[in-house]
Amino acid sequence: MVMPTVVSDRMGTIDFIDYTNNHVFSKCQTDSLNTVNNGSLKHDDYLHGLANGKLVAKQMIGDALRQRVESIDSEFCEPGDEDTFFVADLGEVYRQHLRWKLNLPRVKPFYAVKCHPDERLLQLLAALGTGFDCASKAEIEQVLRMGVDPSRIIYAQPCKTNSYLRYVAQQGVRQMTFDNADELRKIARLYPDAELFLRILTDDSSSLCRFSMKFGASLDSTDGLLGLARQLGLNVVGVSFHVGSGASDPTAFLKAVQDAHVVFQQAAAYGYSLKTLDVGGGFCSDDSFEQMANVLRAALDEYFPAHTGVNLIAEPGRYYASSAFTLACNIIARRTIQDGSAVSVSDSSSMSDDGSVNNGDARYMVYVNDGLYGNFSSIMFDHQHPVAKILRAGGRTMYNSVAAHESSAEDAIEYSIWGPTCDGIDRITESIRFREILDVGDWLYFEDMGAYTKCSATTFNGFSNEHDVIYVCSEPGAMALLGL
């Protein structure tokens, strides 16, 4: 049993659970600090280390969740004690980086800060040597405060605010994107020394979130834009594209790389020697990543082989953040539905002798302390479908057990899960069945909650968008990089 030492800072909304657990890791994991950036990590070693790391991660996350929820009595706790909270495993971010280096060794990741600008996450990625894709002055400021060199930042926002352009010029952040003539003239006026990436239009029809309606120059317009850039004396250094967030069609990368190759040839005709291709984001953290990476890697090897000297970068966001964060929510209210109607306290036919509601064929609406206006906003705009699992019910903690999961048994109880606001659309789950009876004070947890969650939470209805994060680290390499 691995025992944690807890260092907490509730006022700063940060807890860190530090584990002394190097003995449970394989040599692959303890050596990976030295091999992650030199390309010597082998596939079999990675898989062996991954399996070990995942097992330890589950134990650590479970311990952190258990310690927190078992210390809270919803009947007597202070306001805020039972609030939603996250557990973040920085070791998962580290494993994802190993996975990236194994599958796309030539492509340097520039983490999309917008996805989840968590300070600890950014610190680890900076230590791993990644770059950063920033879309605003605030994101650039946050990265620069960590001591990251401006050359490791790309201002990947084709339509920029004038004052932000002046700011990045002062800070020496030179790399940025454009996709239209007006933006070129603005840059020529405010930051003529910038290093520019022409963002091209892609087919993002298979993506969860499409960007082509808003950003990207068509191939019909790229030649003219390159000509204008040359006329204005601007320095175009590369091409960028984005196949959409949460892409599902690997061939989208192939077509985009082919189009980028065409633009490289167009640029050469104007005397530009482009040095970088930015393949954007769209990478998921699930099993589809390897398929996407295989197609992209083959396309890059064909159209931009290593001997050409072209630098390759990407802008992954959810790939790094999604699976690293687990969210715990408290059930704050319950409504019993019998035959399609809410059960009234005065309905004696539905009451037991002790005053409790008979289960029978009842369904329940449970209300939790987070919802679509909070960390579940991704349901609305990111097309996500978070799956609830039982963390604690009936005085028992059930994390990662059979009882925690949805059940298809005939006698399983049906629930819908709702957020805390007064808006009728604030529903997290329309229907899910569990074997357990859930009640006020019980806890649910949701995995894969690191992407576009906390960063887009609002304060609608006066509910807080500041939630505690408990950090664990299931990889010694990550702990070493962070000095923990």
Swiss-Prot record:
Record-marked site positions (Stacks against the aromatic ring of pyridoxal phosphate and stabilizes reaction intermediates): 242
Keyword Acyltransferase: no
This protein's record includes keyword Lyase: yes
Enzyme class at the top of the EC tree: lyase
Cellular localization per UniProt: Cytoplasm
Taxonomic lineage of the native organism: Eukaryota, Fungi, Dikarya, Ascomycota, Pezizomycotina
Catalytic-site annotation from UniProt: 422 (proton donor)
Gene Ontology molecular function: ornithine decarboxylase activity
Top-level division of the source organism's lineage: Eukaryota
InterPro entries: Ala_racemase/Decarboxylase_C, De-COase2_C, De-COase2_CS, De-COase2_N, De-COase2_pyr-phos_BS, Orn/DAP/Arg_de-COase, Orn_de-COase, PLP-binding_barrel
Needed co-factor(s): pyridoxal 5'-phosphate
Annotated residues for binding of pyridoxal 5'-phosphate: 245, 282, 315-318, 452
Complex formation: Homodimer. Only the dimer is catalytically active, as the active sites are constructed of residues from both monomers.
The name this protein goes by in its record: Ornithine decarboxylase
UniProt pathway annotation: Amine and polyamine biosynthesis; putrescine biosynthesis via L-ornithine pathway; putrescine from L-ornithine: step 1/1
Gene3D superfamilies: Alanine racemase, Lyase, Ornithine Decarboxylase, Chain A, domain 1
Reaction catalyzed: L-ornithine + H(+) = putrescine + CO2
Protein family per UniProt: Belongs to the Orn/Lys/Arg decarboxylase class-II family.
Role of this protein: Catalyzes the first and rate-limiting step of polyamine biosynthesis that converts ornithine into putrescine, which is the precursor for the polyamines, spermidine and spermine. Polyamines are essential for cell proliferation and are implicated in cellular processes, ranging from DNA replication to apoptosis.
Main location: cytoplasm
Activity regulation remarks: Inhibited by antizyme (AZ) OAZ1 in response to polyamine levels. AZ inhibits the assembly of the functional homodimer by binding to ODC monomers and targeting them for ubiquitin-independent proteolytic destruction by the 26S proteasome.
EC number from the UniProt entry: 4.1.1.17
Positions of substrate binding: 381-382, 423
GO biological process: putrescine biosynthetic process from arginine, via ornithine
